[in-house]
């Protein structure tokens, strides 16, 4: 008996637990984001509202507001999220619940240990997380984004301008 899939299989996309766009943002767009973020102050990143220990997370963050200055970034991200969601997960997406988090990992041991991008309160509504690689991987050592499902993990593609989209409930 020759079985056919109920849904057509798209051979030309990455059928994984995450979706990515190599060169999702151009070098010029990345430079615009980096330069535009300079007016906002960094603060030490915390883990939820409990503070932070450098053991779990060592980074600095700033929040880029939803305003006309960043509208083009949000529009581009949402277009990519829509494509990824329709291709892989088909989540019922209603709104954006967070401003854009701009994160800088310090050269001296900067990291963020295994974690979920969901938790109590407003972040319990998160469904999809997005990362945009703002630096050229040749400029630093380490810094791999890894996604774990079950007991296996995958190191996702990285390159300046690469956008990686994944369900917030994955490690």
Model regions and ranges:
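Fe(II)/2-oxoglutarate oxygenase catalytic core
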Residues: 1-163, 169-171
